């Protein structure tokens, strides 16, 4: 048995060099598939793992004797690397300052984002945790203002095929099925937003993706944990901030690319591999406006049980 993913339908294989094993038991402790056990002072495979090895690599990474290797599900011993020293990590104060300085930026300088910065952002995003490995996150990269404008223009053309979605008759019909909250969302946000997107694009102004010089669209797959692309996008956004770029998350594009023939044709034209439950677009670029003050944010609630 194996947990399926778009990249694999098989479980990974754990190999143990018994002669090297010291019997410390750390691999047994970290395996949450319960696929390892100690026998005779040595690590060995358990008879009844929970799922079959998912390829997280924890056992291989924790072993002090290099006695364990994991192969499969996109993972191999060549993927191990030495951890950076703790002294090189950001302090909480530095991290919190980054968060406090961050604002959603929608005004960008025309300068492109250098290719090496694009790769550093992707490297940071790849480090995101996943619900179950291997990652089923896909990323569409638009690395110029021209590519961004073409994508946004085509998106607005797609929106024009969805007029029924915010038509009064459709909202009236759906009100009993999707409830008061969704009805209010569609009437007060979706309908005016779609109208503004298309009318502004017709007038030559892009208020969908704001002609940012770099756009990344993070999305999953039918097998992905819904949170995975959102977590990866968040790390990409923070990486962009750390590199001196302005960033902005755009959540209005993904939901409108999931259903119907027009959406399927749009996905095919732009190399979007599949539908997914969650996804988000992140804009990057050198900011055209710099803020002098921050604004305090809050949660809807914090309940301490």
Descriptions of predicted regions:
Residues 1-305:
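Acidic, surface-exposed loops and disordered segments
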